[in-house]
A protein has these predicted regions:
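Early extracytoplasmic/lumenal segment of secretory-pathway proteins
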Residues: 21-84
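Sec/Tat signal peptide C-region and signal peptidase I cleavage site
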Residues: 14-20
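Short secondary-structure capping/turn segments at boundaries of alpha-helices and beta-strands
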Residues: 11-12, 64
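Extracytoplasmic ligand-binding site segments that recognize negatively charged/polar headgroups
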Residues: 72, 77-183
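Sec-dependent signal peptide recognition
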Residues: 1-10
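Short, glycine/serine-rich, charged loops/turns that create anion-binding
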Residues: 18, 31, 166
């Protein structure tokens, strides 16, 4: 299943961002960016990077609303969260001409439904959600989501899913044959 997640970097969280000359403060998903990369960036640019992490879009939103606004220069919400945050006035607007390379965004990513015209976000990552099976432990049919939702006895206690409500609900919808964009 393809899922556009962590696809947007939301720039300058509201007007009172954490901007300070020579410093960059990032709010990013847990374990997405290695410390070595941040160290290399600092060595090459002289800009000190601080990164706080979160494990879900909802945790990020709650943290920002609980007093984290203005703490970060850049945050990395998933696609649907950009729309929520922009609707609540939590994101700054990217002015025309503000990002020199904005015109280099591939057309398929330039005008997403969650941020028309890319006024609050830019593409960052795209990924797929899937599942894998250790075929040494399980030799049955692996081409079905039934092994997740109606697991055979040999998989009992051996199934783990992402801690992401949206991802699991989308997978369950596919399993049950429901359309993805239906209410």
């Amino acid at each position: 299943m393809k899922f556009l997640s962590t696809s947007a970097i939301a720039l300058a969280l509201l007007a009172n961002s954490a901007f300070a000359e020579g410093k960059l403060v990032i709010y990013h998903w847990f374990e997405y960016m290695p410390a070595e990369l941040l160290e290399k960036f600092t060595a090459e640019t002289g800009i000190t990077v601080t990164m706080d992490t979160y494990d879900s879009n909802e945790a990020m939103l709650a943290s920002l609303k609980a007093g984290g606004m203005g703490t970060y220069d850049v945050a990395v919400p998933g696609d649907y969260m950009v729309e929520i945050m922009a609707g609540e006035g939590l994101l700054d607007t990217i002015a025309d001409g503000e990002l020199a390379n904005k015109g280099n965004i591939s057309p398929e990513w330039a005008d997403p439904s969650f941020d028309p015209g890319r006024t609050h976000s830019i593409p960052y990552q795209w990924g797929s959600t899937s599942f894998s099976v250790n075929t040494e432990d399980y030799t049955g049919d692996i081409n079905t989501t039934d092994i997740l939702f109606n697991p055979p006895a040999e998989l009992s206690g051996k199934i783990n899913v992402l801690d992401s409500q949206g991802e699991v609900m989308a997978l369950a919808s596919l399993h049950m044959g429901f359309p993805q964009c239906d209410t």
